[in-house]
Amino acid sequence: MPTFTEDECILIGCYLGETREETILNLEEMSEYISNEEADLDLLTSTAIYKLTQITDDDFYAMCDDFTP
């Protein structure tokens, strides 16, 4: 399973959906609005999306448990 950075976890938490697929779609939709001047955010988003595609749904739900208080 890939390791997520703190920044990736924050980004995923901001666009968290009910499922892994919904979260990926939320991030992809958000990335359409990133300007050329925000290359760091674009890279962070792309990396988070890629890593989300590399994990299982069970891993995703386990990771989401860390996001809830």
Feature annotation, model-predicted:
Residues 16, 31, 52-53:
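Hydrophobic residues in alpha-helical segments
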Residues 28-34:
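Short secondary-structure subsegments characteristic of cysteine-rich extracellular domains
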Residues 1-2, 62-69:
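Short acidic DE-rich linear segments
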Residues 10, 21, 39, 66-67:
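A generic structural signal for solvent-exposed, polar alpha-helical segments
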Residues 1-28:
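N-terminal acidic leader/helix
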Residues 35-65:
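Short, charge-rich amphipathic interface segments used for partner binding and complex assembly
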